[in-house]
């Protein structure tokens, strides 16, 4: 039995393998051809068979190994028996070799909260925009996001039949972020990435105030943060309620681990303790570099309309 002082790295190592399994499930559901789409609250708020299966897989796999965790998932699923084939009990040996940052070495299992988005970018998943899709597992301690795993099931899917499909990015504050090549957006350019399907006047007003050279409208919070760390966008601007804690927890860690910053529109850090409301009601503002420029451009009219 591994010692309890190493609980964070054991959890990250397990979540890495679980996220890879989740990516396989996402691809299998597409390959089978029946997405099992259910409309939740609106035509843009969808749930698929993949959402349901992946959440069952992640939550059941984690809770078997770490029974004292608090796990909060996007999908509201009825309790029931979980198919044994959905359980992943492996762990990344490479991650286990990494040192646990000293500030987290004494963490207890019951102090951790895990935020799960089984399929981030579900609408895009149903429309075949597969590169927008991610699986998100975020880990929080004392209300702060400290570790995150992002699986991209369809990374490389347009690179030809010989390409390796999918990748898993992971990070821990104080250790770093891994599984991708860090790249900054072109200097002097303001390339904004924002929502594809949930725009409104607040969002467009806020983006206009940034003097953008280009605006990218894509699905998925995880996908947008990946655009920041790979130099495809300079800032992620979403001046609206809509995205939830499970959308931002894992991506925030990856961004923060490489020196970026993610806050609400007012510049407040997001809170991830288990009692917190799920909605990021004051929106999201994030950048890898030059965060202060984007924060300084947010109009007062936008700030006053978004109450934290």
Curated annotation (Swiss-Prot):
Binding site for Mg(2+) 2: 117, 120, 247
Cofactor, how bound (note): Binds 3 Mg(2+) ions per subunit.
Regulation acting on activity, per entry: Inhibited by Li(+) and Ca(2+), but not by Na(+).
Keyword Phosphoprotein (UniProt): yes
EC number(s) per entry: 3.1.3.7, 3.1.3.57
SUPFAM superfamilies to which the protein is assigned, alphabetical: Carbohydrate phosphatase
Annotated Mg(2+) 1 binding sites: 74, 117, 119
Residues modified as Phosphothreonine: 122
Superkingdom: Eukaryota
One record GO biological process: phosphatidylinositol phosphate biosynthetic process
Positions of Mg(2+) 3 binding: 74
Keywords from the named record: Acetylation, Hydrolase, Lithium, Magnesium, Metal-binding, Phosphoprotein
Positions of post-translational N-acetylalanine modification: 2
Protein family according to the UniProt entry: Belongs to the inositol monophosphatase superfamily.
Protein's job: Phosphatase that converts 3'(2')-phosphoadenosine 5'-phosphate (PAP) to AMP and adenosine 3'-phosphate 5'-phosphosulfate (PAPS) to adenosine 5'-phosphosulfate (APS). Is also able to hydrolyze inositol 1,4-bisphosphate (Ins(1,4)P2) and inositol 1,3,4-trisphosphate (Ins(1,3,4)P3), but is not active on AMP, 3'-AMP, fructose-1,6-bisphosphate, Ins(1)P, Ins(2)P and Ins(1,4,5)P3. Probably prevents the toxic accumulation of PAP, a compound which inhibits a variety of proteins, including PAPS-utilizing enzymes such as sulfotransferases, and RNA processing enzymes.
Name the UniProt record assigns to this protein: 3'(2'),5'-bisphosphate nucleotidase 1
